[in-house]
Amino acid sequence: PEKVFAFKDEEFVRMWVADMEFGVVPEILDALRARIDRRIFGYTGLYDDEYYRTFSKWCRDHYDWSFPKEQLCVSPGIIPALYQLTETLCGPDEKVLLNTPAYGYFLHAAEYAGVDVLTSPLHKKADGTFEVDYEDFERKCADPACKLVFWCNPHNPTGRMWTEEELHRVAAIIEKYNLWVVSDEIHCDLIRCGRRHIPMAKVMDRYPKLITCMAPTKTFNMAGLAFSNIIIRDPALRARFQERDKLFGMVNPM
């Protein structure tokens, strides 16, 4: 249903979505202009290594992390990827686990797939920061119906950048119960100076049931261009993910 605000535009501040108020940086604008000057906007796919080389270099330079080319899948966004992964991985009698407060689309993805949700509330400390309740988290992971964990790193909405120790503790629990884990890391570049993001993939460096989701869209205010990077280690899941791609591999020509 349509929502009507009883205020004039100048009387309220829109804060419902994570679009920033800063314009796109000149380097990105220059690249977009160069693309526009080609004057061709037909069906587009990734047919060589250039995109992988560019993204993998960013990951090496900023996170000291690398991954094989074949693991990289592209998606119009992390949200549609969440929907697709949840549908693919979970059956009707299985559950997904997420920490609360949580990004709303984790819940929406589960609801869309008809999957029940387990929640493990984060503990709010006296100083206002949040931490994982490890006992509760493990108890929920131990549920025989639990199949998939949605992990958010950095966390939305609390803003927590998880420490390496915290990531190892969470990873150990997930691996103990052999669960799939989707690590949403879309905010990994929107961090304070002097901090460095630690991908869950660096901590779970040999765990095959990890899916990492990243995109430049939040950091660089490009969400409307609709593209994201989904790194899927498991070959069978990767094949199923790509087979269910209703866009047949097409990407934004920009």
Locate predicted features:
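A short helix-loop-beta submotif of the ANL/AMP-binding
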Residues: 112-118
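A short helix->loop->beta-strand "cap" motif at the edges of active sites that frequently abuts
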Residues: 94, 115, 176-179, 207-208
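Active-site phosphate-binding strand-loop segment of PLP-dependent enzymes
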Residues: 124-192
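N-terminal small-domain helix-loop-helix segment of the aminotransferase-like
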Residues: 1-77, 84
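Short acidic capping loops at alpha-helix termini that bridge into adjacent secondary structure
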Residues: 67-72, 92-95, 207-210
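Conserved PLP-anchoring active-site segment centered on the Schiff-base-forming lysine
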Residues: 88-110
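PLP-dependent aminotransferase class I/II
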Residues: 209-254
